[in-house]
Amino acid sequence: MELKIGDAAPAFQSTAVGGIYGAGQPVKLNDFKGSMLVLYFYPKDDTPGCTRQACDLRDTWGEIQSRAELFGVSVDSAASHEKFIKKHGLPFPLLSDPDKVIVQNYGVWVEKSMYGKKYFGTERTTFIIGPDLRIVNILRKVKPAEHVTLLAKALLEQAAA
């Protein structure tokens, strides 16, 4: 089932690495009740598109941080996240989902195809979750180069609503 705007955000529990969470602390969706929350799902640490997306978010961190809590989510390990954060100076935390529970619950673990070969992977998607823990916006299949602009616009729209 594909999530829609207005749906309750699926509950999650994971280990957050980076930002105020340091080398890793448990977090869950309910920790963010009363706050705007952005979960951006990306395929893999330290690949060209994902690095571009993360570094663009890093470069606009002040603007984003003033409007919402932000977490990147991928199926990479916490150790992989630590290396990615250090290598690129990312100021925001990343959630590790090696068992693919969060990506499946959010409907972003999908069949993909490259050079005729089918495989499963994470669809680059961002969910903006309101203070009531309901989904207020979804940016699906975003291109890394456009992500920050689309996210900033969506957050401004939420602030004006």
Task: Report the location of each language-model feature.
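Chalcogenol-based redox active-site neighborhoods
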Residues: 1-161
